[in-house]
Amino acid sequence: MRIGLGYDVHKLVENRPLIIGGVTIPHDKGLLGHSDADVLVHAIMDALLGAAALGDIGKHFPDSDKNFKNISSLLLLSKVKDLINKEGYKIVNIDCTIIAQKPKMLYHIDAMKKNICKCLKLDNNMLNIKATTEEGLGFTGKEEGISANAICLLN
């Protein structure tokens, strides 16, 4: 059994789509990043790579590589799944938290879960996604960015 922990954060900016868990969420700002800046999927990828001792997403998908410009993070997640499977690991479960003051994530979590489970070929009960605010505190509370944490168990 191997445990991995992932964390990601991106700044909210104008003129970018807000994509979290592969879901485009209506909002006046989106997340800035080289790829689609999907903080949830990035945190999950780092957790999976960490548990398998395979480094992090920056090692495998550097922001200096034009091939990853605006790429869907779900495509990268599929590649991470292949990497960990190649090493002989299988996902037991993943638990995640999205930290955002706005917009409310509650209405989008089911679609996020569906996207990620499909990508990783997981049963619905193997992935949990939660969302919280920081009650107006810090950069997420001031709506300057969104962050996500993920923890996974591999066998």
Curated annotation (Swiss-Prot):
Record SUPFAM superfamilies: IpsF-like
Binding, 4-CDP-2-C-methyl-D-erythritol 2-phosphate: 8-10, 34-35, 56-58, 61-65, 100-106, 132-135, 139, 142
Cofactor note: Binds 1 divalent metal cation per subunit.
EC number(s) given by UniProt: 4.6.1.12
Cofactor: a divalent metal cation
Secretion signal, residue range per the UniProt entry: none
Gene Ontology MF: a single term: metal ion binding
One family name in Pfam for this protein: YgbB
Site (Transition state stabilizer): H34, T133
InterPro entries: MECDP_synthase (IPR003526), MECDP_synthase_CS (IPR020555), MECDP_synthase_sf (IPR036571)
BP terms from Gene Ontology: isopentenyl diphosphate biosynthetic process, methylerythritol 4-phosphate pathway; terpenoid biosynthetic process
Enzyme kind, highest EC tier: lyase
Keywords: Isoprene biosynthesis, Lyase, Metal-binding
Catalytic activities: 4-CDP-2-C-methyl-D-erythritol 2-phosphate = 2-C-methyl-D-erythritol 2,4-cyclic diphosphate + CMP
Pathway entry: Isoprenoid biosynthesis; isopentenyl diphosphate biosynthesis via DXP pathway; isopentenyl diphosphate from 1-deoxy-D-xylulose 5-phosphate: step 4/6
Positions of a divalent metal cation binding: D8, H10, H42
Family the entry assigns: Belongs to the IspF family.
Function, as annotated: Involved in the biosynthesis of isopentenyl diphosphate (IPP) and dimethylallyl diphosphate (DMAPP), two major building blocks of isoprenoid compounds. Catalyzes the conversion of 4-diphosphocytidyl-2-C-methyl-D-erythritol 2-phosphate (CDP-ME2P) to 2-C-methyl-D-erythritol 2,4-cyclodiphosphate (ME-CPP) with a corresponding release of cytidine 5-monophosphate (CMP).
PANTHER family: 2-C-METHYL-D-ERYTHRITOL 2,4-CYCLODIPHOSPHATE SYNTHASE, CHLOROPLASTIC
Subunit record text: Homotrimer.
Name of protein: 2-C-methyl-D-erythritol 2,4-cyclodiphosphate synthase
Gene coding for it: ispF
